[in-house]
From Swiss-Prot:
This is Arginine--tRNA ligase. Its EC number is 6.1.1.19. Monomer. It holds the Pfam family DALR_1. Disulfide bonds: none annotated.
Length: 559
């Protein structure tokens, strides 16, 4: 149990005990205790924690919330708990002000836990996170980049929260887009080998594909023209897909993302899985024929309209393949399946959950995290095109421009459902205006304190000999409170699929450190205070390091 959970459990039991006393003495009439909250209030003057139980009890007790709160506070037994005082605020919120004793337990625990601090070691459930899953038909764009940072950070958070996590990339190597890709590659090959052919109107026109075709010519020469067309097309697309997938793997690896599984959509076609799932849903009455095509009854599950799953030409749609893919996920034993999709896929969510339910699975086991668009800015102007390729800026170009750390941090700073304006100039700045630099600088600054201490022959006392109660300044206590929050932040971020919480958390912790650093000296003439502050600095460094590690960002010792 983490520090915050221990305190919350203690406060929760105190509230329950007071409610039971009130009922037994006929001071408050109620049938059952509602699910009340004890949480950190927004305003500091409202204490360390606030409880809303009185407001929730008002209706069934037929009493004013404030009157209920007054009864409960009178009956609360704070002895043996880290409670200094209890106040009632507003309509009936119960505010708890804690003493420092619980905070003074934090340093020893963090120091001993080190890189494990904030993390639950138990492997509770098996979770799959599927993210990026870009079409292997071009370079990785900013949407892919944001999805990569969000998905990988979320996977890191879930691992730290105690889940067994598998990262997966779904390779869209089948279907209509691959046909268009093949048409495009074949046309470019023929054009570059001197044949007069027209490029497909809806073809992929990126300059990167021309480079791939040149590599095909380097391997096979101009002789593919003489082969039967289907053989020629197969050679071209196999080469191109292999090269593109290799590019995706290497680029994402340079972004700090390494997948456990690369799953081929094509395999679902080849092993008959798609048609097996189609037949199963048809037998269950969820698929019907109309206008020459076959439709899934997604309206039965709250969708606006039914969806085609098998075209009139007998070819399954992308949605049908996706249904089969998701059944495969659950067949592999995942308790929880999470997809990170672009917001343009929002219309796909209801029908996907409906298909899962139609297959007999609990749709609550599937979560789909939608993310909004990214706009790149430089000097206040929107950057629409890459100077190098003439198309949209690619992830590898972004990494080259601002670095992996800045890119990952910027992509997860905002909630996934918020549009992201990415300031390229800010991301490159080596100043405290740059959020990732600000946090990394806090870590490096702490490391410099310890280097200075070593240079002066100063060593911290043994951990059990340090008097933590020397830490009395408000800046010191604020840091301790924030460090105590870290395990709960990990837990909440995992439950709510909110990776941005960790970026915000570590920014706040860095701000508290910088404020302390600007007002107080760590190395000083008071040995007891110096030891306590050195320990405070070390646990701050540990927590910043662990938070940055979750974000996939380096924690440098020097800057």
């Amino acid at each position: 149990m983490n520090p915050i959970q221990k305190v919350l459990a203690s406060l929760h039991s105190m509230v329950i005990e007071a409610l039971e006393k009130a009922k037994s003495r006929d001071l408050i009439k109620f049938d059952q205790i509602p699910e009340f909250l004890i949480e950190v209030p927004r305003e500091k003057e409202h204490g360390d924690f606030a409880c809303n139980v009185a407001l929730l009890m008002a209706r069934q007790a037929r009493q004013a919330p404030r009157a209920i709160a007054e009864v409960l506070v009178e009956l609360m037994e704070a002895s043996g708990r880290p409670v200094e005082k209890i106040e009632i605020a507003g309509a009936g919120f119960i505010n708890f002000f804690l003493d420092r004793s619980w905070l003074y337990e934090i340093p020893l625990m963090v120091y001993k836990s080190k890189d494990k601090y904030g993390f639950n070691g138990e492997k509770a459930k098996k979770v799959q996170v599927e993210f990026v899953s870009a079409n292997p038909t071009g370079n990785l764009h900013m949407g892919n980049a944001r999805g990569g940072a969000i998905g990988d950070t979320l996977a890191n958070i879930l691992e730290r929260a105690g889940y067994e996590v598998e990262r997966e990339f779904y390779i869209n190597d089948a279907g209509n887009q691959i046909e268009i890709f093949t048409d495009s590659m074949e046309a470019r090959y023929l054009q570059l080998t001197g044949h007069d052919v027209q490029f497909p109107e809806n073809g992929y026109a990126g300059r990167d594909l021309i480079d791939t075709v040149r590599n095909i010519i380097a391997r096979y020469g101009e002789g593919l023209y003489d082969l039967p067309r289907e053989e020629r097309r197969q050679i071209i697309v196999d080469f191109a897909l292999e090269e593109k997938i290799d590019y995706i793997q290497k680029t994402l690896a340079s972004f700090g993302i390494n997948y456990d599984v690369w799953f081929s959509e094509k395999s679902l076609h080849e092993n008959g899985k798609i048609m097996a799932v189609f037949n199963d849903l048809r037998d269950k009455g969820y698929i019907y024929e109309s206008e020459g095509a076959w439709w899934f009854k997604s309206t039965a599950f709250g969708d606006e309209k039914d969806e085609v799953v098998l075209r009139a030409n007998g070819m399954p749609t992308y949605f049908m393949a996706d249904i089969a893919y998701h059944q495969n996920k659950f067949e592999r034993g995942f308790d929880w399946v999470i997809n990170v999709w672009g917001a343009d896929h929002h219309g796909h969510v209801a029908r996907m959950k409906g298909a899962i339910e139609a297959l007999g699975y609990d749709p609550a086991r599937l979560d789909i995290l939608l993310m909004q668009l990214v706009r790149l800015y430089r000097g206040g102007n929107i950057v629409r095109m890459s100077k190098r390729t003439g198309t949209t800026v690619s992830l590898d170009e972004l990494i080259e421009d601002v670095g992996k750390d800045a890119a990952r941090f910027f992509f997860v700073m905002r909630s996934p459902d918020s549009h992201l304006d990415f300031d390229l100039e800010l991301a490159r700045q080596k100043s405290q205006e740059n959020p990732v630099y600000y946090v990394q600088y806090a870590h490096a600054r702490i490391c410099s304190i310890f280097r200075q201490a070593r240079a002066e022959g100063i060593t911290m006392a043994e951990i059990n000999e340090i008097d933590i109660s020397c830490l009395k300044e408000e800046e010191e206590l604020a840091i301790l409170r924030k460090i105590a929050d870290f395990p709960e932040e990990i837990s909440i971020a995992a439950r709510t699929l909110a990776p941005h919480r960790i970026a915000r958390y570590v920014l706040d912790l860095a701000a508290l450190f910088h404020s302390f650093y600007n007002h107080h000296r760590v190395l000083n003439d008071n040995r007891a205070l110096q030891d306590a502050r050195l320990l405070l600095m070390e646990i701050t460094r540990i927590t910043i390091h662990n938070a940055l590690d979750v974000l996939g960002v380096a924690a440098p010792e020097q800057m």
